[in-house]
From Swiss-Prot:
Family from the record: Belongs to the thioredoxin family.
UniProt keyword annotations, A-Z: Disulfide bond, Electron transport, Redox-active center, Transport
Keyword Transport in annotation: yes
Protein name as catalogued: Thioredoxin
PANTHER family: GEO12009P1
GO molecular function: protein-disulfide reductase activity
Role description: Participates in various redox reactions through the reversible oxidation of its active center dithiol to a disulfide and catalyzes dithiol-disulfide exchange reactions.
Length: 107
């Protein structure tokens, strides 16, 4: 999984091509940390079709706000730099994340 920061987000996500899934988390988010190993496994399953990345919002609050990240965990799917879908908070289960990815890449 690609680790993003406020300096690499624009290049990797907003100027990227294809699908990029961004896992927004923070240091104090227990549900985020619980979900991360499963998301890392998903990244292996979709390798070559979807770029999986994560961004620690603790050091990038303005960036998170600019992307309308209002709660954690949030996983946003971007296509060619545009956010096309996301799951957040209680809906951020590994099943919902995989369903979101499948729905978009199968189009």
């Amino acid at each position: 999984m690609l680790m993003l920061d406020k300096d690499t987000f624009k290049t990797e996500v907003l100027e990227g091509t294809g699908y990029v899934l961004v896992d927004y988390f923070s240091d104090g988010c227990v549900p985020c940390k619980a979900l991360m190993p499963a998301v890392e496994e998903l990244s292996k399953k979709y390798e070559g079709r979807v770029v999986f990345a994560k961004l620690n919002t603790t050091g990038a609050r303005r960036l998170a706000i600019s992307q309308k990240i209002l709660g954690l965990p949030t996983l946003s799917l971007y296509k060619d730099g545009v956010k096309v879908d996301e799951v957040t908070k209680d809906d951020a289960t590994i099943e919902n994340i995989e369903a979101m990815v499948e729905e978009h890449i199968s189009k």
